[in-house]
């Protein structure tokens, strides 16, 4: 059985050392999970029992969001891939072991089309050239595919023919968006967009809800494990249908909308205005009427709610890797929800934030690591905190 398993696993990635994206390439998967468990235990076990990490059945080709940067090699050939770790040198990538296979096929096709259409790649040093990046998002359950072409100018020569040629090779593509990034910046996407084909977004299904995903929207990259993560978060909240819930850092409304069927009301807050637009549309599309979404800084929003004397029963918080800030957590403590469900992609900042919350009257009840990023050193963790009972 072990011999058969070894035969079906892909060969180790040939560019892993240069790319730097997968710190655990070459490490057996069970060993990766042990390393992550050990890391979470070391940081969080002082707050309570850390449950065994929930691993993946198949840790390959799981990323439904794929980004490629385009350049030319020394011979003038068009290459696509990723930036070498801590540099802006492009590492050509033919087959990434964690990125969606279909998306990688589309990127290879685009590389050929650039040559056929004589489109020049962008040169970061000189600022000349046109074609910078490609971003592809694929709906795991819907099968819908969005291709975002990132250019240094608003005009793609022969854009209609380019899109036709691309869709001839890949008729499964449901929308193509032109994103204009004409600044000297390390940011991938610019502010302006133009839809070349389709609706300009895709839809996907998660935990029974349908979600609209735009080029700039945050949506978890591992769809199978995301369902497990969110189901665990809802389970930890132990909602009865009577609770008022806040979904902080709500993105396109995923957690809030999934929780809405188990709660009295949900309020979501998110800084990214594009994500908030999607969240509002997602609520309408799912015919959910007990959810409201607001655009703004989560800390300031919570502060204002606390100042007005508003209270909530449950707080879901899913901050970025930097964790939450003290302003947000101080206002959260002031509002005093009975339960806080904290979803974290960085156990170090989670440990820091738990230290603050446990000093302010909360007790960690459950800690569950979830594998979301196989072959990398990253790990997601969901924690349940409850108000301490005063004797």
PLM features: residue spans?
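Short, acidic/hydrophobic/Gly-rich beta-strand patch recurrent on exposed beta strands
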Residues: 81-84, 148-150, 279
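Rossmann-like S-adenosyl-L-methionine
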Residues: 2-6, 158-160, 164-168, 172-391
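Extended interfacial segments that mediate partner engagement and assembly in macromolecular machines
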Residues: 7, 23-121, 136, 141, ...
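Nucleotide donor/acceptor-binding cores
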Residues: 64, 143-145, 242-243
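Short cysteine clusters
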Residues: 13, 19-22
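Solvent-exposed residues in well-ordered beta-strands and their adjoining turns
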Residues: 2, 69-73, 137, 150-152, ...
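Flexible, glycine-/basic-rich loop-and-beta segments that form/coincide
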Residues: 9, 13, 89, 388-391
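Short, aliphatic-rich beta-strand segments
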Residues: 71, 136, 143-152, 210-214
């Amino acid at each position: 059985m072990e011999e058969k398993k070894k035969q079906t696993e892909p060969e180790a990635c040939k560019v892993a050392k240069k790319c730097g994206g997968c710190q655990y390439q070459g490490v057996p998967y069970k060993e990766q999970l042990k390393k992550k468990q050990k890391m979470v235990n070391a940081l969080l076990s002082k707050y309570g029992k850390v449950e065994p990490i929930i691993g993946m059945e198949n840790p390959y080709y799981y990323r439904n969001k794929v980004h490629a940067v385009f350049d030319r090699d020394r011979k003038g050939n068009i290459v696509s891939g990723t930036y070498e770790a801590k540099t802006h040198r492009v590492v050509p990538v033919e087959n990434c072991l964690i990125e969606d296979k279909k998306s990688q096929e589309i990127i290879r096709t685009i590389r050929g089309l650039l040559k056929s259409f004589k489109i020049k790649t962008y040169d970061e040093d000189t600022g000349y050239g046109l074609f910078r990046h490609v971003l592809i998002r694929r709906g795991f359950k819907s099968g819908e595919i969005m291709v975002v072409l990132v250019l240094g100018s608003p005009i793609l020569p022969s854009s209609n023919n380019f899109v036709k040629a691309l869709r001839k090779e890949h008729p499964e593509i449901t929308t193509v968006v032109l994103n204009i990034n004409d600044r000297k910046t390390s940011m991938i996407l610019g502010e302006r967009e133009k839809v070349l084909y389709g609706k300009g977004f895709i839809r996907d299904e998660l935990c029974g809800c349908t979600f609209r995903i735009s080029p700039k929207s945050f949506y978890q990259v591992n769809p199978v494990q995301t369902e497990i993560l969110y189901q665990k978060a809802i389970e930890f909240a132990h909602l009865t249908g009577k609770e008022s819930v806040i979904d902080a850092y709500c993105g396109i409304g995923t957690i809030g909308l999934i929780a809405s069927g188990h709660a009295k009301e949900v309020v979501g807050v998110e800084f990214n205005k594009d994500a908030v637009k999607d969240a509002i549309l997602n609520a309408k599309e799912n015919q959910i009427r007990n959810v409201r979404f607001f655009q703004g800084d989560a800390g300031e929003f919570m502060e204002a709610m606390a100042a007005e004397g508003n209270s909530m029963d449950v707080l879901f918080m899913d901050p970025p890797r930097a964790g939450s800030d003290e302003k947000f957590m101080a206002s959260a403590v002031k509002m005093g929800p009975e339960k806080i469900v904290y979803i974290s992609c960085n156990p170090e900042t989670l440990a820091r934030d738990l230290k603050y919350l446990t000093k302010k009257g909360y007790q960690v009840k459950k800690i569950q690591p979830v594998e979301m990023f196989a072959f990398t050193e990253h790990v997601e963790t969901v924690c349940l905190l409850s108000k301490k009972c005063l004797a």
